[in-house]
Design a protein with these regions (language model features):
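Basic/aromatic-rich interaction segments and small domains that mediate binding to polyanionic partners
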Residues: 2-69
């Protein structure tokens, strides 16, 4: 599935470690807005989280962990 810039999405962050922050199993449905696609293979997107998690607001997320909101 391809996502567009400014599209509202839900991201599953459970078990990911991003910039030293580990997201626990409960973080399966975080609201975010797509900023841009960052890589084609494997596909990943930079997203702007609705809520900051331990100071993280913009993070890169693999496409398989993103779904439309």
């Amino acid at each position: 599935m391809t996502f567009a810039a400014h599209q509202c999405v839900r991201v599953n962050l459970a078990g990911l470690m991003i910039q030293g922050v580990t997201f626990h199993a409960a973080v399966t449905d975080a609201l975010a807005t797509v900023v841009r696609k960052t890589t084609e293979e494997p596909p990943a997107y930079l997203v702007d989280l609705l809520f900051s998690f331990k100071g993280l607001k913009e993070i890169e997320v693999p496409e398989e962990r993103i779904r439309p909101a």
